[in-house]
Amino acid sequence: MEAEDCTVAVSEANLKDLLLALDVGNTNTVVGLFEGDKLRTHWRLTTHAERTADEVGMWLHQLLRWDQVRVDDLTDVAVSSVVPPMDPRLAEGVRRYLDKEAFFVEPGIRSDMPLSVDAPQELGADRLCDAVAAYAEHGGPCLVLDFGTAITWEVVSAEGEYLGGAIAPGPGVTADALSSKTAKLPSVAMEPPPRVIGKGTVDSIQSGLFYGYLGLIEGVTRRMLDELGDATVVATGGLAQAFASHTDLIQHVEPDLTLHGLRILWQLNRGEAG
């Protein structure tokens, strides 16, 4: 399964917009620069929740300089964050150094996607971005898996209604717990070993983690498809390609799905459509 470019058309009026998009996760922050609907470049950086507003602002300013973008040419800044303590400092850093009031994905924004869940205000920003982007690109019904610090599943109906999903600890969380809670088991890279039956400690751990998670992924996905019926299955996140190459359930791998969802939500709320 090859990674795909997720590009959703926008109005001609927005083709020259320069949007800086920040997907702030618990482990990594992905920063993307959009020119209209095209992702011009992106950077993946470690998330540091204790960053000050000045650090955030200088950090973003330097990324723009690296890509030879003048601050005055930037149209706006959009943020999807699952690290609430960072949000005020992100907003202040953007205000001071980029002279913008950042758009945040938060409860109450326009998404054009009905949220048929018990507590819509609790839906994570990244999960909404994933659902919106997958539906815009593939229509519905669709099911999205995002491999991050947590693994999330998002389900969207044929009519574009968000139906809910599931959340499980990600492979990295489990691997860290295993090495930190045991005296003799080492930390290992999350990758498929050469065989399922391990011949040593490292490949035995890799087998248990990788194929154990593969079973989790396939099990939850199949049960969701049993409830939903046939659907397009899309994966994103750091380990999406690795797992997609070992299962026939995942039809599309789109590494930049969350950023594209953030772009779409920004356009609905502040762009030409807003």
Regions found by a protein language model. Give the residues of each.
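Glycine-rich phosphate-binding loop of actin/hexokinase-like ATP-binding domains
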Residues: 44, 140-176, 232-233, 251-257, ...
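Short glycine-rich, Thr/Ser-proximal phosphate-binding strand/loop in the N-terminal lobe
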Residues: 2, 8-10, 14-62, 160-187, ...
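Short glycine-aspartate micro-motif
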Residues: 19-23, 78, 142-146, 234
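Short, well-ordered amphipathic alpha-helical segments that serve as non-catalytic structural scaffolds
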Residues: 55-67, 216, 220
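Conserved phosphate-binding catalytic cores of ATP/NTP-utilizing and phosphoryl-transfer enzymes
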Residues: 2, 9-16, 112-142, 263-270
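Glycine-rich phosphate-binding loop signature in dinucleotide/nucleotide-binding domains
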Residues: 69-72, 137-139, 224-228
